[in-house]
């Protein structure tokens, strides 16, 4: 499969189809990340690289009408020191695009803010979109376990709930997601991660 993607990339390069070449490179890296099943947790820096590959593909799909900005409030060393379950950010950004920005029918933006909780030392990642938002009831439902019927129908909150549960499985009940939204004004999903997680635990 990788050889096939590489062939597509070179054909696109020869024909000066830059967009196709870049999307193919990003897809190849994403597939390699999926195949890495031996590491449950990865440095935040690696997770952002994966997210960048995913977003590159989406930018071409939406003609550059969606932007993704990363804002660092604290030291960028958080990227190396903080550990996060692989494929945590991508499903949340995907949800923001498909269920937040796309339904409003115009350009949109997603902002990632990384900071530390001064009281606990935890790392907080705030993912904010300017999409259609949701009601308080919908925001509460997102973090509740979906029914079998909802899971089969791929309801909006299934992917978000899965991310929430993986975070709690990895770090404990004190960690995971929280959702703050206003109907018609966008949504903010906050990821809480331990700031001093022992990387050696990931090897067991």
Regions found by a protein language model. Give the residues of each.
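Two-component histidine phosphotransfer core
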Residues: 2-178, 188
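C-terminal end segment of the histidine kinase catalytic
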Residues: 177-204
